[in-house]
Structures are given as C-alpha cells and as structure tokens.
C-alpha cells in the first residue's frame, strides 16, 4: 500500500464512480493550490519576492485553480510590502488586491456551503473561505486605518466588526475540533506507525489525510489521484522542513543562542520534522486554525491596547478585546510552519520589543500566578497552554521561547534580512548593543532585495548607533534613507542634523577630537533648520506623521528661542540635546550600556550654551526628566526620584482638595504624561510588590492626562500596557 500519510479522519458519505473521482480531484486541487500559496508567501519571507509572485502568476493561469487563495496570497505579500514601508502607492495596490480577495472569499464560502463541498474532515464546508474572508477583511481594514481618512476609518471599523463577528463563530468551531482531536489522539507509538510513508508496488492503493472521506476502491487504485496526493504530501513535507523554496532543511542551520558567533546546535543533526509538527494534519485544516488563531489573536490584542475612552465605545457595539487571550492565540499560531506563524512572530516581536514598549523591560512585574498562563512548548495538536510549565516563560515574559521561535525563523529563511534584523533588535533589547551592530554589519544592505526591509535595516541601525553615541555613522545611515524610502524625508533629515549637533557639542567638550568641528556645526545647522521645508515633499499620507509634527514644533521652538535671546548662531538656541529626546522615543535608555549612559549623563549636565544657561522652564523639564531616567538606569534611583519629584512633577500637576489638577502645558506635551509614567516606574523599582497600589495611582494620573498631542498614541499605549500589568498583579 502507498500511504501518503496518516488516517483520513471521520468518514463522509461516499459518492459513486466518476462523480466521486471528480470530487476527489477538486479536494486535492484545493489543497495543492493552498500549498502553492503558502510556498509563494514563504519566498517573500526569504527575501525572494519575485519568485513568489511568479509562482502565483503561473498558478493563476492554470485551469481550475483556486483563485481565492492565490489572490489572498498576493494580497498578503503586498500587505507586507506596504506595512514595512508605509508608502502610498504600495498601500493602494495592497488594498485593491485584498478587496478582491475579500469579495472572492465570500463568494467561495457561499458556493462551498451551497454545494456542500467538504474539504476538511473536522470543519464544516466553507470554513476555510470564512478564514480567508476574515484575513483579507482584517488586513484590508488595517490599511484603511493607516490612510488617516475619516471616511476610510469608518469603513475600516465596519470591516473589523464583520471580521470580529465571523472570527468568533470560527473560533467556536476551532476549539470544538481541537477538543475532539485531543480526546481521540493516538498514543505516540501508534502515531509513529501511522505517520510513516511507504510504497509497495504490488499494491498501488492509498489514503490521504487531505481527503476527508472514505475513498471508493476505484479511487484508491487511481494512479492519477495517487500521484496528485503524493505531490501534495511532498510539498507539505518540504514546507515543514523548510526545504520547499530551494534551501536545505532548516534544522541544519538551527542555533541555540543569538549572535553572529553562535554555531548550529549539535542536536540539529538528530532533528526530525515530526519533533515539531503534526504530520497527520491536512493542509486545509492547518490553514483554518492557524489563520483563525492569528487573526482573532491580533484583533484581541489591538482592541485591548486602545485608549479607555475608545475601548469603552467599541465594547458597547460588541468589540471587546482580551490581551491575554489574544497573545495566547498568536502564540498558538506561531507554532505552525506557515505564513500565519511568521506574521504572528513578527507581531510578537513588535509587541515585546517594539518602539511602543508594551512590555517595558524595566517594569518587570512578575505575573499573577492566578491570572497568567505559561507557554507550553508542545506540538501543535496538543493543548497549547498549560499553567505552571515554565515560570520564566509566561505570556508576560516569554524569554527563551520567543528567542527560540526567532532562531527557527532565521534557520528557515537564511536569505532574509528581515529575520536577521529582528535578531539584532532582540540582542539590542538584551543590552548587547555591540553584538547587535556586528550582526547588522554582517550583511551588505545593498544585497537586500526588498527595498522595504533595506530601509528598515538602515533606520534600525541608525537608532542603534545613536544609543552607542556613534553619531557619524548614524547620520550617514539616516541621510542614505533619502534615496531608499519615501516615509519621512523631513524626519530623516532632522534626525541626522541632531546627530551632527551632538558631535559638535562633544568636540566642544573635548570628548571628540577628529578635526571636524566646523563640519559638524555647519551640517547640524543646515539639516535641523532645513528639515521643515521637506514636509511638503514626502509622498506618504495626506497628513504629517506624528514625529513630523514633533520635529516641526521643535524647530519652531529653536527659532523662537533664537529671537528671544537675540542669538547669531542658531545652534545656540537649542537647549536640551534633541537626539536624547529621540532616543527616548525608541527605547534607547533601556538599551544603553553603563558607559553609554555615563556619556549621556555627561552631555545632559556638562554642556552649556546661551539657551541652556537661560534655564527656560520647559527645556529644564525635558533635561531633568531625561537625566532622572539616566540616573535610574545607572543605579542611582533615589537621586533620580528626587529630581523628578522636586523639579519635574510640580510643573505638571498639583493636588487640590484631594483631586489631581494638571497644568495644561503645550511646549513639549509628550513629556508630561511620560514623566508621570516614569514616576510609576521609579515607584516599582524602589518599592517592589508592596508599592503596586502607588504605581497604579501614578499610571492612572498619566493616563488621565488625556490631551491630544503628536505622540499621544505612542505614549498612551505604553501607559495602558503598564497599567494593565499592574492591575493584573493586584488582581
């Protein structure tokens, strides 16, 4: 007997003769086209977009191909390109394709239900197209929200509402199927015997896990069906091992640790695909539950992070998000070896180590044992979460589990700079800045095929170089982005100017002696004060980005100070070094080493110019806020707290009749709620678990400073995430 693999699940009604043979061909064709779509998307994740798109184009031209999944695959590829660059034309193209996929998915779902086309042994007819519909809806809605058009935003909410409702129904079916499968799972020995593929030429019959019903004797011996089923099996096994896109099996490259100098694990030689994945899982079933887990998980996390006022309104119309449940589902999705797992991993990397600091490393509150769940390292078909498995690997602090997931992606996609970049960011998050830089420098950015990934690599390296105070290279990277990305030429230019300004100040303090003092001075003046003129030349969105508006306000401040003090040199009108503000927005203070922090402290306290010596209250507030953070990171939390309590906070709020009253300041509005957030963090660092109630009070004060300012989303989400963590610990 030829066994493609595994059993065929529950039995369905048998058709007779030619009718059933035609039906079986359709079922296998659908599985084949889904495998082609998954392969095409994996090409993109390996920095080989053209190969992926060519594969889709070839498949689309075949008679009888599943145009729905092929169109969605193209839409996902274009979505990844658009969200990595946020460029207008790419976002428009992705939106059009996803809109088509949405319409096609709905029609395919209705047709499958009407004809009772059953391609899964555990899910009702049409379920897979319900998943493609919600996936295209969700991605399309996100693009509409990014457009910043009120009309498009309203349409996006309607799409999200439809996706949310359908996903709720799908998840009921998925959970029911998982419970049924777990209760009937065979023993490991039985599973091993059933999973072994074999071929005996004297008996050319077969069964396939992709066919959800019992085959007729004619179909079992049909050589064309046998060959088609074997092809799908080979495609799936290649995908699971990572060998399907021309790379050698991924386990040969799998490492145990992060960093450029690490070598493949010795255990990789004994590794088997069956160690990680369920070999009896049909392609359609895999797509259904990985897609449902990913989409519903992301939607839940996003809803949970919305500001309270918006969240309360949405909950009235049925939108409610649970961050823990959402994270749990995304973690389940990344266990799958497909594009859903990869997108889920990118989402988790952004959540745990992104610029919004949803999990501030300094706010390391241990999880509440009653409310948190530990992540299980089990296979896909087992229960994905078990309490108490690993104390250090919870939903709050995934630790080594997140690291291992990223290392698997690096092994699977050795040609992609996207995963290398994420490894470098993870190293930086651990304070290993030099190791992170070495990893980034190990690749020639000009060899990166995806322009969007190339621009991300260059920008992230510039941020890292700023944290290392290597401002020459940082400025070079930022200026080079003018030829790579259309995202924000004004911000790139301003940021580069701030780097040159810091170098000029370092030469004045004798900390840098390279004979380029005049060059730094001229470039800083030119780039900082010319940056606003570039705002009208960028191509992204109809409105300026939040950081664009921040930059514009800062340059206006400098110009006003120059007039106020009647200064000849524009650079003397800049008080607190703006590069340190930008470092805060990108989590720099949590990543700097001790030596880097010492240099930051020196630059904040020892440099003087007319603007600094004028002791402008707003500029002093910024300087003292950043200095207090620096002191805390250097281990002098008591002194940092005194600075915050005595000098910074009295300028932000006061207590009247037991109620908090805020000074509504407009000069640097991001700093006021940020200072209240940092006060909560001081409270935690000095008081530990006994101070959680006080931490909560400070975070509520930060959250209630509900002014609309240019960085309100970034700061507000960080505050809400911390508040949720504190309240979870207090529960």
UniProtKB/Swiss-Prot annotation:
Domain of life, per lineage: Eukaryota
Record-listed Phosphoserine modification sites: 265, 268, 378, 383, 392
Compositionally biased region (Polar residues): 10-26
Keywords (A to Z) from UniProt: Cytoplasm, Nucleus, Phosphoprotein
Ranges where the record places region Disordered: 1-26
Pfam families membership: Iml2-TPR_39
Modified residues (Phosphothreonine): 380
A GO cellular component annotation in the UniProt record: mitochondrial outer membrane
Xref: InterPro entries: Iml2/TPR_39
Subcellular location field: Cytoplasm; Nucleus
Keyword field contains Acetylation: no
Function: Inclusion body (IB) resident protein that interacts strongly with lipid droplet (LD) proteins. Involved in LD-mediated IB clearing after protein folding stress, probably by enabling access to the IBs of an LD-stored soluble sterol derivative that acts as a chaperone in inclusion clearing.
Subunit composition and interactions: Interacts with lipid droplet proteins PET10 and PDR16.
Family assignment from sequence similarity: Belongs to the IML2 family.
Protein name: Inclusion body clearance protein IML2
UniProt source species: Saccharomyces cerevisiae (strain YJM789)
